């Protein structure tokens, strides 16, 4: 198993999309790329920790490649808006790829180059080495699955899931 750590707006959105993808074993919402140890949601939202809302994805590279995970990343958020996704504004919502190895860094840079051909504005996604990942509080985990009728889920997360479903990427079978 390998890991990928990505930030692209509210972690609930990326979590919900990647939980559907075949070859993904787990998705954990959390915080990374800041200077505060053991941050919590309130401190991250204050903008004082430097952390971004991120997801840490554990995946089977025999089923899905890191590069494919990045392709899904580009369709799951807008990488051309600095420190914002829709109405979510602040550095905690920045677009960021946190690589786990030199090979992931290389693939991230290649993926940005390729993705840039599909956007009219420049990609502002940061690429940094992952130093530490802090899982978010329990109530943030599996958010869409446990709160599907919540307004944010309906108006923000569901359209991202629908967009993913239209791509043709493999979707997990029921019960897997």
UniProtKB/Swiss-Prot annotation:
Its EC number is 1.8.4.11. One of its GO terms (molecular function) is peptide-methionine (S)-S-oxide reductase activity. Gene3D superfamilies: Peptide methionine sulphoxide reductase MsrA. It catalyses: L-methionyl-[protein] + [thioredoxin]-disulfide + H2O = L-methionyl-(S)-S-oxide-[protein] + [thioredoxin]-dithiol; [thioredoxin]-disulfide + L-methionine + H2O = L-methionine (S)-S-oxide + [thioredoxin]-dithiol. Transmembrane segments: none annotated. Keywords: Oxidoreductase. InterPro entries: Met_Sox_Rdtase_MsrA_dom, Met_Sox_Rdtase_MsrA_sf. The active site is at 10. GO terms for biological process: protein modification process. Belongs to the MsrA Met sulfoxide reductase family. Has an important function as a repair enzyme for proteins that have been inactivated by oxidation. Catalyzes the reversible oxidation-reduction of methionine sulfoxide in proteins to methionine. NCBIfam families: msrA. This is Peptide methionine sulfoxide reductase MsrA.
